[in-house]
Amino acid sequence: MLMRRITIIVILMLGLLQSCCAGVRKYGVEVVKEYPHDSGAYTQGLFFQDGQLYESTGQYGSSSFRKIDLATGKALEKVDFNRKYFVEGSVILGDELFILTWESRVAFIYDAATLSYKSSYSYPREGWGLTTDGKQLIAS
């Protein structure tokens, strides 16, 4: 009786395992173009806004926010952060640039056009990803 139960359980588990894996789709990718990038930049946030590429980079001692020339990979403009901050996600909403930090739990606000510092505030958790739906900020 015990052996029969074990056999039934094993058969059911194998059936479930097979049905779970049967529906997995595989996708391929094709690289159509490559662009240069600063290999020393530890990318945390990356977005396009009005045809311009922006990147926030994080590392204690070398965090920055950059407006990037896509063709060369060079920073057209750059904001460096105090070495105590590990910068994470960033996004522009309206005329303001929002930048989160990781363990410091600080959010920065800059003028999006000039990259001039406006303010900072305490953020209630670790900052990670940041995006927008065009009306409000969305953080992970």
Q: Where do the protein language model's features map onto the residues?
A:
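Short loop/turn segments that connect beta-strands within beta-propeller blades
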Residues: D69-G73, D111-L115
